[in-house]
Amino acid sequence: MATPGSEPQAFAPALSVTALHPHLHQHHQHHQHHQHHGGTGGTGFNLPLNRGLERALEEAANSGGLNLSARKLKEFPRTTAPGHDLSDTVRADLSKNRLVEVPMELCQFVSLEILNLYHNCIRVIPEAIVNLQMLTHLNLSRNQLSALPACLCGLPLKVLIASNNKLGSLPEEIGQLKQLMELDVSCNEITALPQQIGQLKSLRELNVRRNYLKVLPPELVDLPLVKFDFSCNKVLVIPVCFREMKQLQVLLLENNPLQSPPAQICTKGKVHIFKYLSIQACQIKTSDSLYLPTIERPHLHQHVEDSKKDSDSGVGSDNGDKRLSATEPSDEDTVSLNAPMSNIVEEDQTIKEDACHRLTPTKGEFQPKPSILGDSGISGQEREQLAGRADARHSGLMNYIKDQAEDCEELLRIEEDAHWHMEELLNSSKDRELDIAMIEQLREAELLQDPNGLSADIIERSILNLFPMDSGEASEFPDPSLNGQLQLETSPDREVQNDLMLQSNGSQYSPNEIRENSPSVSPTANITAPFGLKPRSGSWCPEEVQGSLQAESSPRRPQLLSRHVFLRPQRNLESIDPQFTIRRKMEQMREEKELVEQLRESIEMRLKVTLHEDLGAALMDGVVLCHLANHVRPRSVASIHVPSPAVPKLSMAKCRRNVENFLEACRKLGVPEEKLCLPHHILEEKGLVKVGTTVQALLDVTVTKALFT
């Protein structure tokens, strides 16, 4: 018995037979049954058979297995010997012959279960093959079939082998083969698998090796495949859904230009491939959740008036979940965050600590009063009135603290918003030179002042000198350097406090002198304009609370006022270099940009190539730099790891090897050690300036040597 899917083997020998059934002879010949002429069965006459062929037919009649393999037959042999019927044949092997079509005689063997037509010249399969309703194994490999007929899909096949043909596609009716367990269509010209292949619910083994497939249909996931071979095709991506093929044990995928999973994963086997696909699936499912807003992130683009209405500082709140903000930030807010979350949280904590410091002594004043009054014999009604006053004072203090916390929160938001606007101004510096000059002056004024001796008179003078304009114009130029450092209210009480602060610090300028410097603008307008805030006419501080606060902190007047204007923590100013300015930073960035462009021009001019727009990514693998070293001096880098079509991206180990070889070549060529960059400057794409210095030194050294030789 022939083994399906492998090279055909001869059937077991059977008894001899001398003739076929007469009705088979009548189907193809219109001659008399009693004629006897010499020759083979291909002349149209009943010619005598050779002894070996007679023996094979005789064995088939008795055993049910017909073996006519490797006999150079061009058609099925015919004989007129009566009394022998081959219609009960179960197995037929006609492999390694010269048949050009499936013999019609075989289509009459209704009991046929296994048919092997391997290695013939078959181009046509007759529709009469549908008569073989017992056929379960069919081998049509190594023939010249250009298509499988639809009638073939009406058979109860379990094994179908059609490899090494010229098939361009599979019929859509292939989904009718419900009992098919093995399908081999390897070494053909198939460009796509039909969607109906997902209906083969019994398929265990699928071989589409050496075809022209570019896409694997996701319907394959529905199949209970144990072995899947799609090697030597043009597949670029393995669908993520393939991770659900739980019964798959053997996966063959070599010689494909796979991009996902990458070749490094594919070479490790099925387990790593499926793990990669699972990770990809998780990333796809959670891609939307990565942009979900978190309640801890502050608003950046919310209008100031809106934030005043619904912001919650967290002080006196019953629900801790409502801290920092009453509404969840939008996606735009989370994307445009510029400040680290740790700074925001620390600043909020500082605000709460300040509020607690103010609240604690005030509560201490109110709490002893009921006990003292109770001891002096005051009536219950008077006691309730006094308690009501105490509650009113306490609630007023809470509202005042809450208002101040809201103002601080607004400053934090506006500061980040102003920082974002400043970056936009810097990016469009050519069109807004006036704005940038003003920003630089403000930043210098902030950073060059003494961190430990920060006082309000310096701030007021710098603001009044730098903003000699009305509040409408000043609001158009938000400056982040002042945010979080001062916010002076327009109420009469606050103006009195400002005057006191200027006098207590020993300032040489009185409020009147300051107003003379800018007669058209009030100090309040100048101060609030940089923040873009409108004066709050309704903000007030209770007299009792204000008096208690002044009495408690009169020795520490500057510190109290600094809390009122919500200065940023001193740690930020202490960590800033006083010699640093925005102007110097911009000059440094301009120089670095020129060095990077010079690096690009040097490489492109030497190697006659056009580098990618992202220069860091183009140099990261070290290939271009090694070629540059070899261009300067041939064979200075002995071996270079280069990407291939199968592996378009080098591993990090190979990239590091290339970079180290380049740096070693630079040392040998005479580049000074202090001008050599480090490997991570190239590998991490974070030191293009240092890489440019190294490349320029390499070119200069070679030019110098060329002049002296």
From Swiss-Prot:
Residues 24-49, 301-390, 504-526 are annotated as: Disordered. PROSITE patterns: CH, LRR. One of its GO terms (cellular component) is cytoplasm. Pfam families: CH (PF00307), LRR_8 (PF13855). Residues 589-702 form the Calponin-homology (CH) domain. Keywords: Cytoplasm, Leucine-rich repeat, Phosphoprotein, Repeat. Disruption phenotype: No visible phenotype. Mice are viable, fertile and have normal CD4(+) T-cell populations in lymph nodes and spleen. In an experimental autoimmune encephalomyelitis (EAE) disease model, the symptoms, such as paralysis, are more severe. Residues 301-312, 381-390 have a biased composition (Basic and acidic residues). GO terms for biological process: cellular response to chemokine; negative regulation of GTPase activity; negative regulation of T cell migration. The modification Phosphothreonine is found at residue 581. The keyword Phosphoprotein applies. Residues 24-37 have a biased composition (Basic residues). Gene3D superfamilies: Calponin-like domain, Ribonuclease Inhibitor. Its main location: cytoplasm. LRR repeats lie at residues 60-83, 86-108, 109-131, 132-155, 157-176, 177-199, 200-223, 225-244, 245-268. The modification Phosphoserine is found at residues 395, 518, 522. It is found in: Cytoplasm. Acts as a negative regulator of GTPase CDC42 by sequestering CDC42-guanine exchange factor DOCK8. Probably by preventing CDC42 activation, negatively regulates CD4(+) T-cell migration in response to chemokine stimulation. Interacts (via LRR repeats) with unphosphorylated DOCK8 (via DHR-2 domain); the interaction prevents the association between DOCK8 and CDC42. This is Leucine-rich repeat and calponin homology domain-containing protein 1. The gene is Lrch1.
